[in-house]
């Protein structure tokens, strides 16, 4: 089926290229493990060689494009960009990714990243000279075992897509394993079942997206030390595990191409929802990028909405088109119908984190379940949440009691308890001085929710606490 779709897309591209110039050319983003993607990957390697040689003041350079996502607050004696040593020297459009806690990220995360990698794609297309270049994706959510291995060019130490500050086993050609593999196997089907846009956007961000960022940089155990050439520090968080440096690892783009692919699969499904102009205006974000000629482009909410459902590319197994049957997203605060305050520390690999009863007067089919957490330092690894799990039964991600996996990628981004929160996007802090993160699950409405957390990777010494549980109305 996939080969048939790819063939049809290729035929469509051929016919498009032979039509009038007014018609939009369509590009095909391909699986980075496929033979069909080899020319695009080579073009990307060629482009990154050129982009890495450009100065960081050039908007089409590797450094500038990566810094649009984020860049460290301070880099004393910056060896890669002498004109940037601290946050007062930020250049136009730098530090604009949607890793904030303002609430606006719950609508803009997927949309902003779609626009971001689309502009990088255009720059690579022109820089490489490959006129039909499309950004390859790393399809680690596929069921093929080969797709669990990082694609070869990104592992080749002689290529310009290679980065040393990654999990050693990935660079050595070993497949994703352990907690991260469990997360992919269990979470992907769960994500595709979500019917609420805000919850889908947030869940994909905090599970597969964040989980893979952490795994690529640090693995399941977070016990490897790597030198990060961007921050110029040695730590146990590789380049991809740190929001401030993630965009500098070339695998970032193949990773986010796959996240965008998941987004489109959901949009095309019966569960997909679309945002409106009013919703974008009510949750403003900077959509500020550079085109392939290095020209600054600022997009209004109207322009963003006109583009995001009418992109000029498809995936080799997904057509990127507007789903005319999709419903409108319900964006905004939803009424809390029940609250519980377990205030329990997560000190065991597996333990109960509380019980919350539904409101007896609530008659909706679904509710939104929120788990409020606090911690001193960002927890590593992955955690799995189970609902009404039978005592003595193994914890498996294909169990009907599995709610989902959570990661804490970026949870300490902009920590206001020290001098790191100088550029905005500050992490929230609890009354007792701890960092905070809230996870949301879309669940069926039942009488009682007994919740269990299972740590499938990482360590236990992070002072993680579940403070509060809430149930919210699924509808506005």
Question: Can you annotate each of these PLM segments?
Answer:
Residues 2-8:
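Sec-dependent signal peptide recognition
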Residues 19-476:
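Intrinsically disordered, flexible peripheral segments
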Residues 15-17:
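C-terminal motif of bacterial Sec signal peptides marking the signal peptidase cleavage site
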Residues 1-2, 29:
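Generic cytosolic/nucleocytoplasmic N-terminal low-complexity/intrinsically disordered segments
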Residues 11-12:
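Repetitive helical segments and hydrophobic/amphipathic motifs
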């Amino acid at each position: 089926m996939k080969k048939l779709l790819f063939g049809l897309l290729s035929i469509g591209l051929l016919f498009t290229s032979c039509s009038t110039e007014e018609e939009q050319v369509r590009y095909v983003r391909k699986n980075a493990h496929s033979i069909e993607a080899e020319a695009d990957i080579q073009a990307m390697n060629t482009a990154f060689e050129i982009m890495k040689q450009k100065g960081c003041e050039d908007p089409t350079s590797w450094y500038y494009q990566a810094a649009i996502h984020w860049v460290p607050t301070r880099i004393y004696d910056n060896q890669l960009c002498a004109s940037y040593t601290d946050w007062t020297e930020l250049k136009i459009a730098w530090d604009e990714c949607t890793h904030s806690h303002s609430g606006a990220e719950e609508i803009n995360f997927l949309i902003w990243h779609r626009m971001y990698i689309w502009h990088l794609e255009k720059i690579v297309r022109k820089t490489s000279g490959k006129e039909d270049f499309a950004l390859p994706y790393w399809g680690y959510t596929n069921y093929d075992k080969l797709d669990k291995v990082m694609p070869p060019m990104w592992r080749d130490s002689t290529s310009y897509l290679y980065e040393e500050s990654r999990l050693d086993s990935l660079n050595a050609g070993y497949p994703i394993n352990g907690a991260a593999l469990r997360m992919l196997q269990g979470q992907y089907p769960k994500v595709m079942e979500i019917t609420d846009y805000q919850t889908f956007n947030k869940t994909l961000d905090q599970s597969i997206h964040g989980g893979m960022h952490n795994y690529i940089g640090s693995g399941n155990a977070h016990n490897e030390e790597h030198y990060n050439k961007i921050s110029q520090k040695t730590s146990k968080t590789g380049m991809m595990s740190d929001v401030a440096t993630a965009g500098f690892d070339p695998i970032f783009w193949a990773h986010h191409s796959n996240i965008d692919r998941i987004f489109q699969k959901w949009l095309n499904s019966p569960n997909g929802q679309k945002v409106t102009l009013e919703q974008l205006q009510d949750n403003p974000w900077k959509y500020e990028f550079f085109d392939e000629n290095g020209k600054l482009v600022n997009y209004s909410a109207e322009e963003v909405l006109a583009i995001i459902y009418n992109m000029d590319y498809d995936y080799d197994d997904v057509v990127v088109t507007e789903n005319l049957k999709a419903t409108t997203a319900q964006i905004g605060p939803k009424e809390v119908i029940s609250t519980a305050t377990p205030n329990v520390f997560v000190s065991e690999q597996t333990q109960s984190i509380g019980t919350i009863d539904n409101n007896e007067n609530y008659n909706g089919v679904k509710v939104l379940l929120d788990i409020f957490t606090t911690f001193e330092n960002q927890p590593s690894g992955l955690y799995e949440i189970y609902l009404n799990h039978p005592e003595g039964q193994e914890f498996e991600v294909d169990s009907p009691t599995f709610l989902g996996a959570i990661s804490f990628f970026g949870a300490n981004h902009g920590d206001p308890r020290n001098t790191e929160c100088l550029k905005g996007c500050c992490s929230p802090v609890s009354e007792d001085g701890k960092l905070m993160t809230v996870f949301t699950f879309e669940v069926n409405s039942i009488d009682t929710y007994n919740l269990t957390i299972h740590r499938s990777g990482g360590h236990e010494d992070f002072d993680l606490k579940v403070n509060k549980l809430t149930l919210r109305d699924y509808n506005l």
